[in-house]
Amino acid sequence: MSLLIDFIDETEEVKEAYMSLIREVLEKAAQMENIEDGAEVSVTFVDNERIREINRDYRDKDQPTDVISFAMEEMGEGEMEIVGAEMPRMLGDLIISIPRAKEQAEEYGHSFDRELGFLALHGFLHLLGYDHMTEEEEKEMFGRQKEILEAFGLGR
Protein backbone atom coordinates (compact mmCIF):
# COMPACT_ATOMS: atom_id res chain seq x y z
CA MET A 1 0.00 0.00 0.00
CA SER A 2 1.51 3.26 -1.03
CA LEU A 3 -0.12 6.61 -0.36
CA LEU A 4 1.79 9.61 -1.68
CA ILE A 5 1.83 12.36 0.96
CA ASP A 6 3.21 15.84 0.36
CA PHE A 7 4.03 17.66 3.62
CA ILE A 8 4.26 21.46 3.81
CA ASP A 9 5.31 22.94 7.15
CA GLU A 10 4.49 26.65 7.21
CA THR A 11 5.25 26.74 10.95
CA GLU A 12 8.80 25.37 10.57
CA GLU A 13 8.37 23.55 13.88
CA VAL A 14 7.01 20.12 12.94
CA LYS A 15 9.59 17.41 13.57
CA GLU A 16 10.20 14.65 11.04
CA ALA A 17 8.97 12.14 13.63
CA TYR A 18 5.52 13.77 13.60
CA MET A 19 5.39 13.65 9.81
CA SER A 20 6.35 9.96 9.95
CA LEU A 21 3.59 9.32 12.48
CA ILE A 22 1.00 11.01 10.25
CA ARG A 23 2.32 9.11 7.22
CA GLU A 24 1.89 5.81 9.07
CA VAL A 25 -1.60 6.68 10.38
CA LEU A 26 -2.78 7.71 6.91
CA GLU A 27 -1.19 4.61 5.31
CA LYS A 28 -3.09 2.46 7.83
CA ALA A 29 -6.33 4.32 7.08
CA ALA A 30 -5.78 3.99 3.32
CA GLN A 31 -5.19 0.26 3.76
CA MET A 32 -8.30 -0.21 5.92
CA GLU A 33 -10.38 1.89 3.47
CA ASN A 34 -9.03 -0.03 0.44
CA ILE A 35 -7.59 3.06 -1.25
CA GLU A 36 -5.61 2.14 -4.36
CA ASP A 37 -1.82 2.51 -4.53
CA GLY A 38 -0.54 5.85 -5.72
CA ALA A 39 -3.38 7.98 -4.34
CA GLU A 40 -2.16 11.41 -3.24
CA VAL A 41 -2.88 13.76 -0.35
CA SER A 42 -1.17 16.91 0.90
CA VAL A 43 -0.80 17.84 4.57
CA THR A 44 -0.01 21.45 5.47
CA PHE A 45 0.89 22.58 8.99
CA VAL A 46 -0.10 26.14 9.85
CA ASP A 47 -0.58 28.47 12.82
CA ASN A 48 -3.91 29.62 14.28
CA GLU A 49 -3.88 32.89 12.35
CA ARG A 50 -3.49 31.12 8.99
CA ILE A 51 -6.14 28.47 9.66
CA ARG A 52 -8.49 31.23 10.81
CA GLU A 53 -8.02 33.00 7.45
CA ILE A 54 -8.71 29.78 5.56
CA ASN A 55 -11.73 28.99 7.75
CA ARG A 56 -13.09 32.50 7.17
CA ASP A 57 -12.42 32.58 3.42
CA TYR A 58 -13.70 29.10 2.57
CA ARG A 59 -16.17 28.24 5.32
CA ASP A 60 -17.46 31.66 6.46
CA LYS A 61 -16.32 30.91 10.03
CA ASP A 62 -14.08 33.67 11.38
CA GLN A 63 -12.28 31.60 14.01
CA PRO A 64 -9.36 29.20 14.18
CA THR A 65 -10.09 25.48 14.01
CA ASP A 66 -7.99 22.32 14.33
CA VAL A 67 -8.17 20.74 10.86
CA ILE A 68 -9.71 21.65 7.52
CA SER A 69 -9.97 19.29 4.57
CA PHE A 70 -10.47 20.11 0.91
CA ALA A 71 -11.56 17.05 -1.07
CA MET A 72 -10.42 17.09 -4.69
CA GLU A 73 -13.02 14.56 -5.78
CA GLU A 74 -16.01 16.77 -4.99
CA MET A 75 -17.22 18.28 -8.25
CA GLY A 76 -17.80 22.02 -8.12
CA GLU A 77 -20.48 23.77 -10.11
CA GLY A 78 -19.57 23.88 -13.80
CA GLU A 79 -16.64 21.45 -13.43
CA MET A 80 -16.34 18.50 -15.77
CA GLU A 81 -15.06 15.10 -14.73
CA ILE A 82 -11.94 13.90 -16.55
CA VAL A 83 -12.66 10.36 -17.69
CA GLY A 84 -10.07 7.84 -18.80
CA ALA A 85 -7.04 9.90 -17.82
CA GLU A 86 -4.32 7.71 -16.33
CA MET A 87 -3.53 10.00 -13.43
CA PRO A 88 -2.99 9.23 -9.75
CA ARG A 89 -6.07 9.67 -7.59
CA MET A 90 -5.74 13.05 -5.85
CA LEU A 91 -7.75 12.81 -2.64
CA GLY A 92 -7.23 16.40 -1.49
CA ASP A 93 -5.58 18.66 1.05
CA LEU A 94 -5.45 18.59 4.84
CA ILE A 95 -4.57 21.73 6.79
CA ILE A 96 -3.71 21.25 10.47
CA SER A 97 -3.20 23.99 13.06
CA ILE A 98 -0.20 23.02 15.18
CA PRO A 99 -1.01 25.44 18.05
CA ARG A 100 -4.61 24.17 18.14
CA ALA A 101 -3.39 20.56 18.15
CA LYS A 102 -1.16 21.34 21.15
CA GLU A 103 -4.03 23.08 22.97
CA GLN A 104 -6.40 20.18 22.36
CA ALA A 105 -3.87 17.53 23.42
CA GLU A 106 -3.55 19.33 26.74
CA GLU A 107 -7.31 19.93 27.00
CA TYR A 108 -8.14 16.26 26.36
CA GLY A 109 -5.28 14.93 28.48
CA HIS A 110 -3.47 12.93 25.83
CA SER A 111 -0.23 13.20 23.89
CA PHE A 112 0.49 15.60 21.04
CA ASP A 113 1.23 12.49 18.93
CA ARG A 114 -2.26 11.15 19.51
CA GLU A 115 -3.88 14.51 18.73
CA LEU A 116 -1.90 14.94 15.51
CA GLY A 117 -2.74 11.40 14.43
CA PHE A 118 -6.40 11.95 15.27
CA LEU A 119 -6.62 15.27 13.38
CA ALA A 120 -4.87 13.89 10.29
CA LEU A 121 -7.15 10.84 10.29
CA HIS A 122 -10.27 12.94 10.88
CA GLY A 123 -9.45 15.18 7.92
CA PHE A 124 -8.49 12.17 5.77
CA LEU A 125 -11.85 10.50 6.41
CA HIS A 126 -13.56 13.73 5.30
CA LEU A 127 -11.57 13.49 2.04
CA LEU A 128 -13.01 10.00 1.57
CA GLY A 129 -16.57 11.28 1.98
CA TYR A 130 -17.21 10.67 5.67
CA ASP A 131 -19.03 13.43 7.53
CA HIS A 132 -20.69 14.17 10.88
CA MET A 133 -23.53 16.52 9.98
CA THR A 134 -26.20 14.09 11.21
CA GLU A 135 -26.23 11.78 14.21
CA GLU A 136 -26.07 8.74 11.91
CA GLU A 137 -23.10 10.13 9.94
CA GLU A 138 -21.33 11.06 13.17
CA LYS A 139 -21.76 7.56 14.57
CA GLU A 140 -20.34 6.03 11.37
CA MET A 141 -17.41 8.45 11.05
CA PHE A 142 -16.40 8.48 14.71
CA GLY A 143 -16.74 4.70 14.88
CA ARG A 144 -14.40 4.33 11.90
CA GLN A 145 -11.94 6.82 13.42
CA LYS A 146 -11.87 4.82 16.64
CA GLU A 147 -11.32 1.54 14.74
CA ILE A 148 -8.41 2.92 12.73
CA LEU A 149 -6.75 4.68 15.69
CA GLU A 150 -7.01 1.52 17.80
CA ALA A 151 -5.65 -0.64 14.96
CA PHE A 152 -2.71 1.77 14.74
CA GLY A 153 -2.19 1.87 18.53
CA LEU A 154 -3.41 5.42 19.16
CA GLY A 155 -6.68 4.53 20.87
CA ARG A 156 -7.74 6.21 24.08
From Swiss-Prot:
<dbReference type="GO" id="GO:0005737">
    <property type="term" value="C:cytoplasm"/>
</dbReference>
<dbReference type="GO" id="GO:0008270">
    <property type="term" value="F:zinc ion binding"/>
</dbReference>
<dbReference type="InterPro" id="IPR020549">
    <property type="entry name" value="YbeY_CS"/>
</dbReference>
<feature type="binding site">
    <location>
        <position position="132"/>
    </location>
    <ligand>
        <name>Zn(2+)</name>
    </ligand>
</feature>
<dbReference type="GO" id="GO:0004521">
    <property type="term" value="F:RNA endonuclease activity"/>
</dbReference>
<dbReference type="Pfam" id="PF02130">
    <property type="entry name" value="YbeY"/>
</dbReference>
<dbReference type="InterPro" id="IPR002036">
    <property type="entry name" value="YbeY"/>
</dbReference>
<protein>
    <recommendedName>
        <fullName>Endoribonuclease YbeY</fullName>
        <ecNumber>3.1.-.-</ecNumber>
    </recommendedName>
</protein>
<feature type="binding site">
    <location>
        <position position="126"/>
    </location>
    <ligand>
        <name>Zn(2+)</name>
    </ligand>
</feature>
<keyword id="KW-0255">Endonuclease</keyword>
<keyword id="KW-0378">Hydrolase</keyword>
<keyword id="KW-0963">Cytoplasm</keyword>
<dbReference type="GO" id="GO:0004222">
    <property type="term" value="F:metalloendopeptidase activity"/>
</dbReference>
<keyword id="KW-0698">rRNA processing</keyword>
<comment type="similarity">
    <text>Belongs to the endoribonuclease YbeY family.</text>
</comment>
<dbReference type="GO" id="GO:0006364">
    <property type="term" value="P:rRNA processing"/>
</dbReference>
<dbReference type="InterPro" id="IPR023091">
    <property type="entry name" value="MetalPrtase_cat_dom_sf_prd"/>
</dbReference>
<comment type="function">
    <text>Single strand-specific metallo-endoribonuclease involved in late-stage 70S ribosome quality control and in maturation of the 3' terminus of the 16S rRNA.</text>
</comment>
<keyword id="KW-0690">Ribosome biogenesis</keyword>
<keyword id="KW-0540">Nuclease</keyword>
<keyword id="KW-0862">Zinc</keyword>
<feature type="binding site">
    <location>
        <position position="122"/>
    </location>
    <ligand>
        <name>Zn(2+)</name>
    </ligand>
</feature>
<keyword id="KW-0479">Metal-binding</keyword>
